[in-house]
């Protein structure tokens, strides 16, 4: 992965990378692999009414990276006021759709911030999504954390992310923390939102073509969850649809 990133930067004549660091395992691994390229790396913390534990893990990880890799620098951009101002600007609504829209807006504010520093330094944004999120259940925000230039770990299953994180001696607090997208005002984690663990979703990805009679009741339940997410979020994984105009119409 490190060599792939270096080769991409070389071919693109780009001199550095920008990564958003959240305190989660995916961004911790991605930022570590980017740091290992030896190229300039800006790690950006972007708290939005964030839990103190997430902020603490993020800071510890960035401090660890900077102590180990001289090519790493960091920025702390507190987006609390920006987000709160946005919330006040849109109509009040008590629906779930309103809360979900605001959650996704947090992710999109972070994308805007990452690309500000990317353009400022003529760097590129490295995404932090793994294979289960990006190509299994589409568990990310379109034009939010899905808005990136390269995806170094998007071919790694979540279990492989954990294995590599341990190999690279990433902070155990990060490894042991329950995965969360950090987009809500409560303590819900990814499993709460999905209805299954990443280990279960991985199994479902491999069970997708098996006969249901070969599966346990829980496996059937998780497979149904997987298929539902995969179907409803498939638009995130495909190119933007283009209306093709027949030449004889022009």
PLM region spans:
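ATP/NTP-dependent adenylation/nucleotidyl-transfer catalytic domains that generate, transfer
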Residues: 2-19, 32-42, 49-50, 61-82, ...
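Short, surface-exposed alpha-helical segments at coil->helix boundaries
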Residues: 27, 31, 52-59
């Amino acid at each position: 992965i490190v060599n792939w990133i270096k080769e991409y930067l070389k071919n693109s004549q780009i001199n550095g990378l920008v990564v958003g660091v959240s305190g989660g395992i995916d961004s911790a691994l991605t930022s570590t692999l980017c740091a290992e390229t030896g190229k300039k790396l800006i790690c950006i913390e972007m708290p939005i009414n964030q839990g103190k534990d997430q902020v603490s893990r993020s800071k510890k990880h960035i401090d660890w990276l900077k102590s180990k890799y001289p090519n790493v620098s960091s920025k702390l951009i507190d987006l609390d006021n920006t987000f709160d101002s946005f919330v006040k600007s849109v109509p009040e609504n008590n629906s779930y759709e309103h809360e979900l829209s605001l959650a996704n807006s947090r992710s999109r504010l972070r994308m805007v911030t990452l690309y500000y520093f990317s353009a400022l330094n003529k760097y590129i944004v490295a995404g932090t999504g793994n294979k289960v999120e990006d190509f299994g259940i589409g568990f990310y925000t379109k034009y939010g954390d899905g808005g990136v230039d390269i995806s170094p770990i998007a071919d790694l299953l979540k279990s492989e992310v954990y294995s590599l994180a341990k190999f690279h001696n990433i902070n155990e607090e990060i490894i042991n923390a329950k995965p969360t997208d950090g987009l809500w005002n409560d303590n819900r984690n990814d499993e709460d939102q999905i209805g299954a663990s990443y280990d279960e979703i991985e199994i479902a990805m491999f069970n997708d073509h098996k006969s249901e009679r070969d599966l346990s009741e829980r496996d059937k339940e998780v497979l149904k969850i997987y298929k539902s997410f995969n179907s409803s979020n498939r638009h995130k994984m495909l190119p933007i649809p283009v209306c093709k105009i027949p030449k004889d119409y022009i």
